[in-house]
Curated annotation (Swiss-Prot):
Role: This protein is one of the early assembly proteins of the 50S ribosomal subunit, although it is not seen to bind rRNA by itself. It is important during the early stages of 50S assembly.
GO biological process, one term: negative regulation of translation
GO molecular function, one term: structural constituent of ribosome
Name under which the protein is recorded: Large ribosomal subunit protein uL13
Gene3D superfamilies attached to this UniProt entry: Ribosomal protein L13
Family: Belongs to the universal ribosomal protein uL13 family.
Assembly mode: Part of the 50S ribosomal subunit.
CDD domains according to UniProt: Ribosomal_L13 (cd00392)
Gene it is expressed from: rplM
NCBIfam families tied to this protein: rplM_bact
Gene Ontology cellular component annotations, sorted alphabetically: cytosolic large ribosomal subunit
Length: 147
């Protein structure tokens, strides 16, 4: 019997909506990365983008455990010597909560050409509203949220 390889035209993509209220950031990122890659499907192949679209709402209400809010830092570099900038996650969540969630999810995707394609299927919104009602997204529930 031959190994099944999914073709890009055969992939059935669904839309999922995730409410990030009181969900731990790492748990949110790992579950979202699984949905974006398509690892929850029986037709998963690591070299084909079989993932679904994911909408994350209420990114501003995501939870970080312990003292990570003050101690964990987000880094970026301008490309020039001495151009390394760092920001605490408390500042990042206050200024741009969507970037904090996107950064965590991007870190859990593979470091290859498919990652950009998979990340383009991620839509993150700070509030409860999103413009994707026409796609009829299905709610995705987490079994455990922050205490």
């Amino acid at each position: 019997m031959r190994t099944y390889t999914p073709k890009p035209g055969d992939v059935q993509r669904q839309w999922h909506v995730i409410d990030a209220t009181d969900v731990v950031l790492g748990r949110l990122a790992s579950q979202t990365a699984t949905l974006l890659r398509g690892k929850h499907k029986p037709t998963f192949a690591p070299h084909v983008d079989t993932g679904d679209f994911v909408i994350i709402i209420n990114a501003e209400k995501v939870a970080l455990t312990g003292s990570k809010l003050q101690k964990k830092r987000a880094y970026r570099h301008s490309g020039y010597p001495g151009g390394l900038k760092s920001t605490s996650y408390a500042e990042l969540l206050e200024k741009n909560p969507t970037r904090a969630v996107e950064k965590a999810i991007k870190g859990m995707l593979p470091k290859n050409k498919l990652a950009a394609q998979q990340l383009s299927k991620l839509k993150v919104y700070a509030g409860a509203e999103h413009p994707h009602q026409a796609q009829q997204p299905k709610p995705y529930e987490f079994t455990q949220v922050a205490q």
